[in-house]
Amino acid sequence: MTLSKARTLLSIGLLSVAETVCSPARNPDIHPLMIERIGKARPLYGEADTLTLTVIGDIMLHSRQMEYPYGPFLAGVAPRLREADFAIGNMEFTLGGEPYSGYPAFSAPDSYAEYAAECGIDIFLTANNHILDKGLKGLARTIEVYERMEDEWNVRFTGSAVNEEDKCRRYPLMVRKKGFNIALLNFTYGTNAGGLSGSWPATFRMNREDIAGAIDRAEEKMADFIIALPHWGNEYELRHSRSQIELAEWMIAEGVDVIVGSHPHVVQDSCTIDGKPVFFSIGNAVSNMSAANTQIGMTVTLKFSRDRNGDKRMLEPEVTYNWCSLPGKLCDNYSTVEVKDCLECRERWVNETDYYKMKRTYTYVKETTGVSD
């Protein structure tokens, strides 16, 4: 029995989800340029296959980062991103245009998003607390740039929309490759801009009725697996909150297969709920942060397999810890590297204090969260 059929049977007797204003899609939508990414059609059954989907932490652009060329920022993790079938990044900034700015109201150059795409990120998450830093006009321009990049860079985005119809198309975002059909749900607890709720364009909020509607649409579109990517939790806390576990339990009961969260800017603990993996927060990917535990983050690689009978299942997720070194530490720029590759490479560091800070933080976060790589 396939996972989709099993989910349908198991859903009998569960609490019914709220109705949604979005009508069922008669044909699953697919971006035309994804045809190039998917390649030639292959038989659904008759051959074994594996799909990899890698999620990296918060991609930020503080004011000081703008003083440096982007090149080294993600170069150390780009090979892992590029080798994945899909790589996902939380774009924690707007593309609101000039004047460019960092914290507390982020507006990055368009070239920064293009750089992320060059590094292998092909799905941008936009539901975060900073997406309205430049108001509705800033969000509208951000969406406009990402829509252009869909055509020019063959990327996708989710987490925000220009109107209700666009929301139904992007929430969930359906991605397809190798005969797998994956649904992505990206939403945020809120934004830093008050008074804009209910206006368009809009970001997707952490509202159970909306989430349930997105899960319904994922099932209508015959999703093999549903992945939730929430922006939630308490900043700088290494353990999940009560509200996180309550929502996680509810989402798993509703049909979500795996949860990978962001927002706290640190790695949080993980768990399984009914056998489904939950990563409450994977921390930062690149930023100017240097407070305790904010320089370490994770990439989580999700693997989905299909056997020769056509049966699909999720394999054990793979975790890789990363370290974001600031200028003058590892090199003269920002540089995110994979920790395990650098544990015995003290000679690479310009400033040895950062090397030892990386080793201490790596050990402490693993022991505190229980998340091992």
Predicted regions and their residues:
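Acidic, metal/ion-coordinating pockets
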Residues: S23-D373
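Bacterial N-terminal signal peptides
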Residues: S11-E19
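Bacterial N-terminal signal peptides that target proteins for export
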Residues: M1-L10
